[in-house]
């Protein structure tokens, strides 16, 4: 069987009808008989196989379908009171930034902002934008390591905080930044090409990245509000990126929103919450 949150990212699934897009697939010559039934997070799909239970030394416990798309599980872990008031960032190598909707938004505005509709827990829609995230810092750090100087993230953050603010900005989603390589060099070339001050030190490069991400988040918040017609007062950041306190603070400054952080292990916690709901340990996602 195919789990809903994953099916929704294949471009073969109709999230309005909750079924495969059979007509479209037939027109494209894609055989539909290879597609399996779609199941939803929280459904019990069977029990652990006897041989596996024996190997693990456990009983044949139920197997629960969770949000198998990692961002789907991460969003399920976001600790919020008002489901309509928050915008989330699942922060890691990529930043997945969006809101939860009851149904897909396929408006011209969504298309123009390059927003996508992906499935979530409880048949919700994760209406989001994919943004290049901490990859830029990670790849810069790898380059400096290749050059013989591996600095901790804490040290890079210290140097960045000491650098001049708003000296230069880049588009984190610029095509040249997408692949592995000498990221500091590419960032410097981008700044030179766009007539900006070229960052020279490691601290200047990292500050450029951090501020650029924060402004990208602001642009996305404004786009989300424009397309949905809602006002989002809180930005909830989950995932490993919350360890970067500087970017979290810059995000609060740029978006002029309250920023709430945690959990770090968002995907794992969201996974457990769905299993707990399925087994009756908690009554709903809010209790989780």
Q: What do these predicted regions represent?
A:
Residues 40, 239, 263:
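Small/polar loops that bind or transfer phosphate-bearing groups
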Residues 1-14, 37-40:
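Short beta-strand-loop/turn "lid" adjacent to the catalytic site in phosphate-handling enzymes
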Residues 25-43, 272:
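A conserved helix-loop-beta module that forms one wall/lid of the active-site cleft
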Residues 1, 12-22, 26-27, 50-234, ...:
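Active-site core segments that coordinate phosphate-bearing ligands/cofactors
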């Amino acid at each position: 069987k195919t789990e809903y949150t994953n099916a929704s990212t294949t471009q073969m699934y109709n999230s309005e009808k909750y079924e495969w897009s059979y007509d479209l697939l037939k027109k494209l010559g894609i055989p539909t008989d290879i597609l399996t039934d779609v199941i939803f997070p929280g459904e019990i799909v069977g029990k652990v196989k006897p041989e596996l239970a024996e190997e693990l030394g456990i009983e044949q416990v139920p197997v629960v379908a969770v949000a198998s798309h990692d961002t789907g599980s991460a969003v399920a872990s976001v600790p919020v009171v008002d489901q309509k008031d928050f915008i989330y960032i699942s922060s890691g190598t990529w930043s997945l930034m969006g809101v939860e909707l009851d149904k897909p938004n396929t408006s011209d505005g969504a298309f123009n902002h390059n927003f996508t509709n992906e499935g979530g827990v409880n048949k919700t829609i994760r209406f989001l934008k994919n943004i290049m995230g901490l990859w830029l810092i990670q790849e810069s750090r790898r380059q400096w390591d290749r050059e013989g100087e591996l600095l901790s993230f804490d040290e890079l953050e210290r140097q960045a905080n000491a650098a001049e603010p708003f000296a230069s900005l880049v588009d984190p989603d610029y095509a040249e930044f997408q692949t592995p390589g000498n990221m500091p060099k590419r960032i410097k070339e981008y700044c030179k090409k766009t007539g900006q001050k070229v960052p020279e030190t490691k601290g200047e490069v990292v500050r450029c990245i951090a501020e650029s991400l924060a402004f990208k988040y602001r642009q996305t918040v404004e786009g989300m509000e424009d397309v949905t017609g809602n006002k989002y007062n809180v930005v909830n950041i989950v995932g490993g990126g919350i360890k970067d306190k500087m970017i979290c603070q810059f995000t609060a400054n740029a978006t002029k929103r309250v920023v709430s952080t945690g959990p770090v292990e968002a995907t794992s916690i969201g996974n457990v919450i769905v299993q707990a709901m399925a087994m009756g340990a908690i009554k709903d996602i809010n209790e989780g």
